[in-house]
Amino acid sequence: MQTIALAVIGGTGVYTLSQLDDVQVYEVETLYGRPSGPIRVGMLFGQRVAFFARHGEEHALPPHKINYRANIAALQQLGVSRVLALNTVGGINEAFGPRTLVCPDQLIDYTWGRVSTFCEEVGSEVLHVDFGHPYSPLLRGCLLRAARDVDVSLVEYGCYGVTQGPRLETIAEIARLRRDGCDLVGMTGMPEAALAREKGLEYACLGIVSNWAAGCGDGAEITMGEILSNVATVFRN
């Protein structure tokens, strides 16, 4: 197979990458089961790019039921070395309102019960990977430069608080995340980032702010319609 320059993982509201040309579809089996869906590989701006939807193409997988290990292992089996994760998130920091694009540099993991390592099988090597900087500086740099080159507004920092889901958070929970230093909240950033690090993949996140987190902004009730509408607006622009 020809080298794949980049894999893109789609989040809520991003179930296809319609710009891909000459698409080949791969149904990948891994030691950890099947990934969230077929992986589509095609040409984008002269580069081979892979894409799949983290929640499945019909959004059938809630955050805590996603087979994160199979997703990362499948990309590695296809020869992927760089992964751009699209994550639909809520804004906590007052500077990160709906339809803002953010390239976070830190995260805090509040999830529980998710299989978060490849180091569980008998005979597997136990890896204590350095996770001080959870996102690849190399890939983050590429993303930030690309945004500047095409004059796209992209916030260059932020701490992503990863919660369990699938429900949204309470106002008190968001207040806690704010005190902890979180700027954004979402449900799928972990264990995906840690698994990518264990496999030696360059991994970065592009956060798409779809709504204010509970108790932030105007304090209005958060609806799925608002989330999907704001994500669609970002991609139309």
From Swiss-Prot:
Homotrimer. GO terms for cellular component: cytosol. This is Probable S-methyl-5'-thioinosine phosphorylase. It comes from Xylella fastidiosa (strain 9a5c). It catalyses: S-methyl-5'-thioinosine + phosphate = 5-(methylsulfanyl)-alpha-D-ribose 1-phosphate + hypoxanthine. One of its GO terms (molecular function) is S-methyl-5-thioadenosine phosphorylase activity. Pfam families: PNP_UDP_1. Substrate binds at M187, N211, W212, A213. Belongs to the PNP/MTAP phosphorylase family. MTAP subfamily. GO terms for biological process: L-methionine salvage from methylthioadenosine; purine ribonucleoside salvage.
